[in-house]
Design a protein with these regions (language model features):
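N-terminal helix-turn-helix DNA-binding core of bacterial DNA-binding proteins
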Residues: 23-61
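Charged, amphipathic alpha-helical coiled-coil/dimerization segments
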Residues: 71-123
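Terminal interaction helix/tail motif
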Residues: 104, 108-152
Length: 187
């Protein structure tokens, strides 16, 4: 029996191959973890643009994430700022240079390939991969990193969205960005 006879093994090998093909397009200017951190910061909400959230997204230690963030800061791709209401909190923002680099993101090739899938296939793939990612995440550290839709913390009404977890009003755009505190609403 071939080592690729089982469907789960074939799928795992394909996922790994897709990852290698996508990483092969990455410019030498950034390491893979740096690309991932920069991508995350560009699509995360303001509550999630913090070193701990980046570490959770990268599934690494805070120390390793800190090294990645320092490299991005040295390259002028992100900047650190203190939170306006809590000076103990560090907020991370992509710079104009960082956002411009993302326009040349090597991941665009993979995004375009996925965009060519029939919508039902893309939806099924997204749901399946999210389930697999959830299963692989360390127990007790399973941030979903989704927008506000379907989150138990979202309080919406009267044209205003509010996050009960952070006790803050949210702009329309903010509700669509990745959040480290997303917790699926009970159905």
């Amino acid at each position: 029996m071939s080592q690729f006879a089982s469907a789960p093994l074939r799928i795992a090998a394909l996922i790994e191959r897709i990852g290698r093909l996508a990483r092969a397009r990455e410019a030498a200017t950034l390491a893979p973890a740096q690309w991932e951190a920069l991508r995350f910061l560009a699509r995360a909400n303001s509550f999630s643009r913090q070193p701990g959230a980046v570490a959770a997204w990268l599934a690494t230690t805070k120390g390793t994430a800190s090294q990645t963030l320092m490299a991005l800061e040295r390259k002028g791709l992100i900047r650190k700022a203190r939170h306006p209401s809590d000076g103990r909190v560090t907020r991370l923002e992509p710079t104009a240079v960082g956002l411009a680099l993302l326009e040349e993101d090597p991941l665009h090739g993979l995004v375009e390939a996925i965009a060519r899938l029939p919508p039902l296939h893309a939806a099924a793939l997204s749901q399946s991969l999210a389930h697999i990612a959830g299963d692989l995440a360390p127990e007790g550290a399973k941030p979903v990193f989704a927008g506000c839709a379907g989150c138990r913390h979202l309080e919406a009404g009267g044209g205003v969205s509010r996050c009960r977890n952070f006790g803050a009003d949210l702009s329309g755009e903010e509700t669509t960005l990745a959040c480290v505190a997303h917790s699926p609403a009970e159905v």
